């Protein structure tokens, strides 16, 4: 028998009046309960409970009495509240409703600060000649005709060819212009499954899955395969869709320096050693997350080194190839073909967009058959978002056939991309003001202000901007207005305006939603080329853009 310390009493004394009162209450309560069917079971429960813990009986009785009193008091409370309500006539109620002004959904100060962005957004009205468009801005107050378009992501322009147009017309006649709903609820038609097969065949994977919106593909796929306790190691310059995917994954996320394989290996080695010491009950899923051609900088991910590291440390590789599919490789098959590697073994999950080089809309995911099957029951965007219209799907199937039979468009695009890059990278007059961050193989050229020029003109650095963003995020401020950043955005827009007004050339700023960004980023200009341009057209347009950059930068120095 266990020894009982002397400090504990052998019994807890109960005051006599409590014992007497409880005895009378129990006697009469017992008489009442014995007259009720099933009451003997309640009596038996109370006896056992009271024998083990007398105070428990008191607490339970008190709670029962409180519940009865609370229930009985509710009707009276309702009556008192009803009496306090003003007796208004219908006319008075209508007058109050008419006078009521709801609070704005958006902070008016934020609307004023962002209004210039809306005014500067171009709207395409028509395209009489390929790559030459008519646009309007600021609610039709500005109109520009015969503008040379260097802002389109339709890199191959195959969707604008007659064979694809004929396929689209036929599909609309046969299928109409919309889908019935999500894929699992009669949204998918035969053409959707045909395109999934075509994508898998073209890119050399076991399967593929279509998504209605390319922006939602990554944020739906990655969370479908991760949970709490899993580990993700991501590049610190991934785009907003991938950032959303990381936030929704519920995993522990680590970042390595942009395209720095030494930084990545050090981090992978550290995590592997940490896992050995922790002796986890289950092996976590582990992913390396990066992009093929980076959305915000245009440079290239080193796939061979990434594949070696993911095999060495037993990680899976997730690559967003929104801007590399249709652009890289001899036949436009993306990052793996560019490095002469087998996609099925090099990359575990590939996310792509049909709204860029393929010239349609929506997104897709490539991988093995098990991964594809799991998405159909576990990916939110696949299960709950509406399917693509049939004509957008058949157009991509036709584009893939054209790419497979003839790679002239891809080869032309790659030559123009290199020419675009060399035109700006080799110009010494620009080096004091802007730097080219893109790879020569990227169809999108990114121009950022040099750190020295940004610091001199706007008084901040990329690191300082990120620190300010992080501080605002900790304060839960959704309206992230940072004046130096806004001034730089307006300055870059002045370059866009100068090229448009003086040379009829349309370029664009890199669209950044600052309040959504969670990683370091700075504004940049974007210049896009496509396979339908002639080398001479592109050269002349590049010269015009360079003149606009020099004019605005030199003017600001005065």
From Swiss-Prot:
Q: Where in the cell is it found?
A: Cytoplasm; Endoplasmic reticulum membrane
Spans within the Cytoplasmic topological domain: 85-341, 458-558
Q: Which cofactor does the UniProt annotation name?
A: pyridoxal 5'-phosphate
A Pfam family that this protein carries is Aminotran_1_2
A GO CC term assigned to this protein in UniProt? serine palmitoyltransferase complex
Tell me which InterPro entries the record gives: Aminotransferase_I/II_large, AON_synthase_class-II, PyrdxlP-dep_Trfase, PyrdxlP-dep_Trfase_major
Molecular function terms from GO = pyridoxal phosphate binding; serine C-palmitoyltransferase activity
User: Which sequence ranges are marked TM in the entry?
Assistant: 50-84, 342-371, 425-457
**What keywords is this UniProt entry annotated with?**
Acyltransferase, Cytoplasm, Endoplasmic reticulum, Lipid metabolism, Membrane, Phosphoprotein, Pyridoxal phosphate, Sphingolipid metabolism, Transferase, Transmembrane, Transmembrane helix
Reactions this protein catalyses = L-serine + hexadecanoyl-CoA + H(+) = 3-oxosphinganine + CO2 + CoA
Q: Cite the annotated pathway.
A: Lipid metabolism; sphingolipid metabolism
**Enzyme Commission number:** 2.3.1.50
Q: What class of enzyme is it?
A: transferase
Modified residues annotated as Phosphothreonine in this record: 121
Protein topology in the membrane:
Multi-pass membrane protein
State the remark under miscellaneous. Answer: Present with 22400 molecules/cell in log phase SD medium.
Q: Please name the PANTHER family in this protein's record.
A: CLASS II AMINOTRANSFERASE/8-AMINO-7-OXONONANOATE SYNTHASE, SERINE PALMITOYLTRANSFERASE 1
Q: What does this protein do?
A: Component of serine palmitoyltransferase (SPT), which catalyzes the committed step in the synthesis of sphingolipids, the condensation of serine with palmitoyl CoA to form the long chain base 3-ketosphinganine.
According to its UniProt record, which protein family does this protein belong to?
Belongs to the class-II pyridoxal-phosphate-dependent aminotransferase family.
**Can you quote the domain comment?**
The first transmembrane domain is not required for stability, membrane association, interaction with LCB2, or enzymatic activity. The second and third transmembrane domains are required for stability and interaction with LCB2.
**Quaternary structure (record):** LCB1 and LCB2 encode essential subunits of the enzyme and form a heterodimer. Component of the SPOTS complex, at least composed of LCB1/2 (LCB1 and/or LCB2), ORM1/2 (ORM1 and/or ORM2), SAC1 and TSC3. Interacts with LCB2 and TSC3.
Task: Supply the name of the protein.
Answer: Serine palmitoyltransferase 1
Query: Which gene carries the instructions for this protein?
Result: LCB1
């Amino acid at each position: 028998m266990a020894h009982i310390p002397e400090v504990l009493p052998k019994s807890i004394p109960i005051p006599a009046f409590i014992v007497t009162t409880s005895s009378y209450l129990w006697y009469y309560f017992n008489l009442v309960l014995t007259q009720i069917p099933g009451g003997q079971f309640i009596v038996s429960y109370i006896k056992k409970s009271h024998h083990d813990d007398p105070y428990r009986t008191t607490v339970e009785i008190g709670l029962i009495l409180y519940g009865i009193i609370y229930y009985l008091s509710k009707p009276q409370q309702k009556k008192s509240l009803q009496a306090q309500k003003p007796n208004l006539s219908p006319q008075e109620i209508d007058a109050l409703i008419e006078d009521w002004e709801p609070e704005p959904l958006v902070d008016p100060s934020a609307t004023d600060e962002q209004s210039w962005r809306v005014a500067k957004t171009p709207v395409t009205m028509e395209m009489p000649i390929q790559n030459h468009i008519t646009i309007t801005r600021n609610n039709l107050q500005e109109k520009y005709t015969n503008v040379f378009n260097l802002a389109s992501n339709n890199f191959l322009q195959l969707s604008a060819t007659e064979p694809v147009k004929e396929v689209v017309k036929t599909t609309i006649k046969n299928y109409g212009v919309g889908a019935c709903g999500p894929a699992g609820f009669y949204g998918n038609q035969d053409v959707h499954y045909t395109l999934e097969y075509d994508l898998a065949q073209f890119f050399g994977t076991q399967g593929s899955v279509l998504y209605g919106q390319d922006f939602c593909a990554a944020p739906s796929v990655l969370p479908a395969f991760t949970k709490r306790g899993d580990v993700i190691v991501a590049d610190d310059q991934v785009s907003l869709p991938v950032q959303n995917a990381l936030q929704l994954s519920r995993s522990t996320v680590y970042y390595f320096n942009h395209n720095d394989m030494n930084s990545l290996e050090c981090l992978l080695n550290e995590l592997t050693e940490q896992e050995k010491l922790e002796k986890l009950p289950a092996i976590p899923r582990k992913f390396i997350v990066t992009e093929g051609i980076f959305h915000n900088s245009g440079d290239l991910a080193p796939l061979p080194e990434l594949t070696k590291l993911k095999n060495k440390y037993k990680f899976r590789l997730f690559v967003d190839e929104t801007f590399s599919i249709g652009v890289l490789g001899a036949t436009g098959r993306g990052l793996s073909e560019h490095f002469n590697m087998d996609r099925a073994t090099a990359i575990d999950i590939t996310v792509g967009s049909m709204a860029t080089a393929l010239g349609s809309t929506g997104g897709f995911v490539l991988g093995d058959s098990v991964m594809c099957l799991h998405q159909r029951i576990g990916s939110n965007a696949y299960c709950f978002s509406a399917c693509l219209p049939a004509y957008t799907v058949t157009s991509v199937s036709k584009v893939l056939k054209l790419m497979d039979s003839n790679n002239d468009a891809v080869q032309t695009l790659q030559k123009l991309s290199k020419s675009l890059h060399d035109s700006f990278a080799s110009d010494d007059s620009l080096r004091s003001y802007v730097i080219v961050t893109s790879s020569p193989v990227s169809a999108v050229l990114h121009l950022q202000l040099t750190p020295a020029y940004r610091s001199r003109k706007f008084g901040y650095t990329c690191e300082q901007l990120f620190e300010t963003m992080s501080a605002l995020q900790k304060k839960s401020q959704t309206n992230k207005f940072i004046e130096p950043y806004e001034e730089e955005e307006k300055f870059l827009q002045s370059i866009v305006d100068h090229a448009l007004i003086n040379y009829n050339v349309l370029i664009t700023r890199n669209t950044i939603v600052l309040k959504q960004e969670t990683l370091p980023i700075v504004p940049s200009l974007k210049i896009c080329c496509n396979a339908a341009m002639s080398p001479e057209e592109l050269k002349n347009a590049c010269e015009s853009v360079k003149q606009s950059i020099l004019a605005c930068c030199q003017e600001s120095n005065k």
